[in-house]
């Protein structure tokens, strides 16, 4: 980190990038499919390019490629953006994901890949908002369906799946394996709710006091 303050989103991506499941080939492939459904994947002919501003994320994607025996890739750095490019004879499509994701752990790995691919989360001190941008509406609708299976009330706008409720975001973070981030998020959420409740009580007390004063003035 070198003393540089990271965003809430970057912290979450760092945590997810360090999940130690790379020996499980099925989960690796499911997460890889999740990345491929995201908006930050660019396909030109046989060339596939993934771009991100997270160093941890680019390393994670490279590890997935290594595990899948895709060794011929190049990593480039332009300004703040990291990109990785590789060649692929047969690029997986959404139908492959639909057929492959039969088990619970694979569905979770896929959604984690979605978020690492093109997801972001606001600092909950400011507002509750998590979103993932997909390459097309079909991919967005598929992930929306998966989230509904886990009773996570996400919404969709064109090719973006988003959450605006604190409790739903917490469930989503836990689902994809962001356990440290869940604890941070919940701590901020509880403090925020307490502050809102205190403000509500103070406003209510102030309003009642004003009514009492006004009534007393009228009677005087």
Give residue ranges: language-model regions.
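Short, Lys/Arg-enriched N-terminal segments with co-localized hydrophobic residues
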Residues: 1-5
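N-terminal basic/disordered segments at the start of proteins
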Residues: 6-39
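Alpha-helical structural motif
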Residues: 8, 12, 28, 57, ...
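Short, mixed-charge, low-aromatic patches
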Residues: 14-22, 96-104, 197-201
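Helix N-terminus capping/helix-initiation residues
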Residues: 24, 54, 165, 208-209
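DNA-contacting interfaces and partner/effector-binding or oligomerization modules
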Residues: 31, 38-189
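Extended mid-to-C-terminal alpha-helical interaction segments
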Residues: 177-220
